[in-house]
């Protein structure tokens, strides 16, 4: 059977829609879950198109529009774009296309990094599309004057994390090649500019050592979601823990296993298919 729509009334806890190209956005979802347990969460992992970071901004924008439409159709009242690439490619356009829906996106945490660096050198690990987007350039221009910004795209890292190999030999090699040149230039603060990367935090910290601060923006994004919910009068701080519903455009069975492994939780996972440029939910036999 299909997952039921999640109808919303003013007396209910407003459902929160969250999406990413894969499991990366779960790093954001877990913080939202911890801060807003009384709100239903609807998460979509567009794993058939992962990674977004090597795709054109136009492609990512089209995916983001349709995923947003799908999540709203499932009852989401607020959309968290838990993907740096999708935020860079589509956040502004999404707000124009869906003017009645509040959006929370991922902004590279350059501002806190620039304010706390002592060496004046900040590293950013992100995807090519994130660096190409106007959002990154704008954040650097506004908040990192006088700070040296070192960038690395970590090619192949998202794929390794999606495969559950964030601590594997290949992921370690990718990260070492990205981070070692930064260390040689006295970097003392590194920003994780992709929501997949917090799942490789142990490996990153082993390479950087204790003297480098690694900034994961996920908790700040969750706090912003709380502020937006409060602003719209939708915040429900007490009540029973509401359900989490997951959708994937790839294998629901594999995603169920990944979620259990990385979050130590079990949630219902439903399959959706891209039919042309439209997402269609697949019948599921329970």
Task: Label the model's feature ranges.
Residues 1-286:
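Non-catalytic structural scaffold of enzyme domains
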């Amino acid at each position: 059977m299909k997952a039921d729509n999640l109808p919303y009334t003013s007396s209910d806890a407003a459902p929160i829609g969250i999406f990413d190209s894969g499991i990366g956005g779960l790093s954001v979802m877990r913080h939202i879950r911890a801060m807003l347990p009384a709100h239903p969460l609807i998460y979509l992992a567009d794993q058939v198109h992962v990674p977004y970071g090597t795709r054109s901004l136009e492609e990512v924008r089209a995916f983001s529009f349709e995923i947003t439409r799908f999540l709203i159709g499932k009852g989401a009242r607020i959309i968290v774009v838990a993907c740096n690439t999708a935020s860079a490619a589509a956040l502004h356009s999404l707000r124009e296309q869906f003017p009645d829906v509040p959006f929370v996106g991922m902004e590279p945490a350059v501002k806190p990094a620039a304010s706390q660096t002592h060496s004046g050198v900040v590293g950013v690990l992100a995807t090519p599309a994130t660096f190409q987007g106007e959002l990154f350039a704008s954040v650097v221009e506004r908040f990192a004057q006088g700070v040296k910004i070192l960038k690395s795209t970590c090619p192949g890292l998202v794929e390794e994390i999606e495969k559950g190999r964030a601590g594997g030999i290949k992921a370690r090699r990718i990260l070492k090649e990205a981070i070692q040149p930064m260390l040689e230039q006295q970097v003392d603060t590194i920003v994780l500019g992709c929501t997949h990367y917090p799942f490789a935090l142990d490996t990153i910290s082993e390479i950087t050592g204790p003297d480098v601060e690694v900034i994961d923006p996920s908790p700040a994004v969750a706090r912003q979601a709380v502020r937006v919910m409060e602003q719209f009068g939708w915040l429900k701080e007490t009540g029973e823990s509401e359900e989490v519903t997951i959708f994937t455009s790839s294998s629901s069975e594999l995603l169920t296993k990944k979620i259990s492994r990385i979050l130590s939780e079990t949630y219902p996972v439903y399959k959706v298919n891209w039919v042309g440029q439209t997402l269609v939910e697949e019948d599921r036999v329970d």
